Structure formats: structure tokens, C-alpha cells
A protein has these predicted regions:
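Short beta-strand/loop segment at the start of cytosolic alpha/beta domains
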Residues: 1-7, 19
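Amphipathic alpha-helical interaction surfaces in cytosolic regulatory modules
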Residues: 15-88
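Short acidic-hydrophobic, aromatic-tinged amphipathic segments that line or gate anion-handling sites
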Residues: 89-93
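Conserved beta-strand segments of the P-loop GTPase G domain that flank and frequently precede/overlap
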Residues: 6-8, 36-37
Length: 103
């Protein structure tokens, strides 16, 4: 499986969602699954959540994956409250993610 790591900025919101979505979709178009490094992202808006969900759906339609790694407490709270955490494979570390991918 071809995989690329994409590192999110400190926020994913209405100001940067289009760029993030375009970059994730470009990775998927290359035939790669995406590991989304969220270790510095401390805020995600509803627009940002839609980007994640849309990217996950596109990945699935292509037989690829979207993995979330290193979610901060702030973003984890938002994802738990909205129920979005149930839609994604979420890992604490890159090592955990790599082990899951390898199996």
C-alpha cells in the first residue's frame, strides 16, 4: 500500500479548509492512502470536520484509507462530542499507525 503523510496546521477551519482538502485529494489521486498527522492541530471547525469526512469517503471509494494520528485533546473532544471519532481509524502515534497498516 502506498502511503503519504500529510501534516495539518494548528487549525483546520474556514480559512484553510480548501487548501487542505485539495492537498489531501491530490494525494489520493496519486493512488496513495493518507496518514493525517494532527499532532499540532488544536482546533477543527465544522468545515474542517466536513473536509475529514469527505476525504475519508473519497479514499474509501478508491480503495484507499485515511488514518488520523496524534489527535490533540482539544480536537479529540470535538470529535467525541460530534461522533466523528467513530468514522475514522485513529492512532496515538505514527508507530501504532504503522503497526496497524502492516497487519
Amino acid at each position: 500500500m502506498n502511503i503519504e503523510i500529510y501534516k495539518l496546521a494548528e487549525e483546520l477551519d474556514s480559512f484553510n479548509y480548501q487548501q487542505v482538502q485539495d492537498e489531501i485529494l491530490a494525494i489520493l489521486e496519486k493512488g496513495c492512502s493518507v496518514v493525517l498527522d494532527m499532532t499540532v492541530c488544536h482546533y477543527i471547525s465544522s468545515t474542517g470536520l466536513r473536509v475529514l469526512l469527505y476525504s475519508k469517503k473519497v479514499a474509501a471509494s478508491k480503495g484507499q484509507e485515511l488514518y488520523l494520528v496524534g489527535i490533540t485533546d482539544e480536537v479529540n473532544d470535538i470529535m467525541n462530542v460530534t461522533g466523528f471519532n467513530s468514522f475514522f481509524d485513529i492512532f496515538s502515534t505514527m508507530e501504532e499507525c504503522q503497526k496497524a497498516i502492516d497487519h
